[in-house]
């Protein structure tokens, strides 16, 4: 149960703001990042609620999977410790809001939000006495390296997409699927999601974006689907692929971090219920697109 909860819960990070995956998708798909972030909130909380409901029901039926903390141990936790734990989460939330909140409400641009977030984190580290010239130099070097990496990733994806556009690949695939094979647009969408599930077992989200996004996103738009909504579907499918046996990306990371007595088979068994739940969540977002589109439409208006 514990390994399943850790793996399933960790996948929610790429759905909720400030999701780097949605930022990359927005840049490659030329879609507004603010709307993508807001579109991920509804499905992200939906998956979280589905996880919680499953855990509560499962632990109620099998109490040994999640025994409650002993009364003696709970009494040892003072109100002062609870307040300190609560205060520890306020600063990270404030930093996150300084990046995402100001950008979503239109007070800052994406670049300005990044600078504000970096400045806020630096000030917090300085206030706690955890920063010096050596640390600052190391952070700047690593930040520059990551920024350059993402620049080349986006450049490669855009160049890849331009080549496909120039060759007419999107139109050719549309003709193949819709006219020669007689498929409906929804059939094409399901096939796309299945390819993401397959590739996600051995590739990360960035690699998949570079390989297929330049081809899939123009096709999605030509089929009449909302690219904002599709970005959320892409992220959910990545989440499922990461934890799908036998080659899920996160499964082997969990095996590397878990105690030796927890086998790979145990990890496989623990994650299967959560994979099923995430598939249910994906189907719900496909059938009811408003789960993803309602919030950005309320904030920014209909596109």
Could you tell me what each predicted segment is?
Residues 1-303:
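Alpha-helical transmembrane segments of multi-pass membrane transport proteins
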């Amino acid at each position: 149960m514990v390994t399943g909860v850790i793996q399933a819960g960790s996948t929610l990070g790429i759905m909720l703001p400030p999701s780097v995956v949605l930022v990359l998708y927005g840049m490659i798909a030329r879609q507004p990042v603010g709307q993508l972030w807001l579109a991920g909130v509804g499905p992200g909380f939906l998956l979280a609620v589905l996880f919680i409901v499953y855990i509560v029901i499962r632990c109620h039926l099998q109490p040994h999977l999640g025994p409650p903390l002993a009364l003696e141990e709970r009494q040892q936790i003072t109100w002062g410790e609870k307040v300190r734990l609560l205060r520890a989460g306020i600063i990270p939330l404030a930093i996150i809001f300084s990046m995402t909140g100001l950008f979503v409400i239109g007070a800052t641009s994406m670049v300005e939000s990044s600078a504000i977030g970096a400045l806020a984190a630096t000030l917090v580290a300085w206030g706690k006495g955890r920063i010096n010239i050596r640390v600052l130099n190391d952070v700047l070097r690593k930040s520059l390296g990551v920024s350059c990496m993402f620049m080349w990733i986006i450049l490669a994806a855009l160049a890849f997409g331009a080549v496909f556009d120039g060759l007419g690949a999107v139109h050719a695939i549309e003709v193949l699927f819709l006219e020669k094979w007689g498929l409906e647009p929804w059939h094409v969408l399901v096939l796309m999601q299945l390819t993401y599930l397959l590739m996600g077992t051995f590739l990360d989200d960035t690699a998949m974006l570079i390989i297929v996004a330049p081809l899939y996103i123009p096709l999605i738009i030509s089929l009449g689907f909302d690219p904002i909504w599709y970005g959320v579907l892409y992220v959910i499918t990545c989440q499922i692929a990461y934890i799908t046996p036998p080659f899920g990306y996160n499964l082997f990371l969990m095996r590397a971090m878990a105690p030796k007595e927890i086998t790979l088979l145990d990890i496989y068994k623990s994650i299967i219920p959560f994979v099923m739940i995430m598939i249910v969540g994906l189907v719900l977002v496909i059938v009811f697109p408003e789960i993803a589109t309602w919030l950005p439409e309320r904030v920014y208006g209909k596109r």
